[in-house]
Amino acid sequence: RTTMAALAAQYASAGMTLDKQEGFPYFLTVNRNAGTVTVYTLDENDQYTVPFMAMVCSGGTDTPTGYWGTPVSYPWRLLAGPCYGQYATRIWSSYLFHSVPYYSQHKDDLEYDEFNKLGTLASLGCIRLAVVDVKWIYDNCPIGTPVCIYDDAETPGPMGKPGTMYTDPADESKRGWDPTDPDPANP
């Protein structure tokens, strides 16, 4: 079981701290095993210990564990496949937070079968999220935001694992859209 104290100890062993980093209101943790992202904010001692929100995600067996600061973000990013991800934020090297893949850079061209895998190990190593969640990271987490990716099979995180939404592969009018996408054109 990984507690915040255990994460703090692991973070410290990597030469890092849970202490406030100026300009960064959030600290993101990814539990690769559980398929959850937990966003922490600052407590009264200026440490990232207060769970703020949780998101369901999909990593992969090649998703690295460790500690980084996000170096860059993109509205759309070419991914392996080739396919595309919306609201991509680089974690480290070629690993990103991004939406479930799209066949093209069009919001109605979602790989809908992949959307239905959210919450499971389904990626080639990146962290996939629903559009509403990855857009939140893109909009609210400045470049340099600290990220920790770890494994804990016993508990998804302090806020649990959120439920997932599914697309209906038979519904041709809606299946190409991420159902969480706030775009007004989303059916």
Regions found by a protein language model. Name each.
Residues 1-6, 185-187:
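N-terminal secretory targeting signals
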Residues 6-110, 183:
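Gly/Pro-biased beta-strand-loop elements
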Residues 74-187:
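Exported/periplasmic cell-wall-interacting domains
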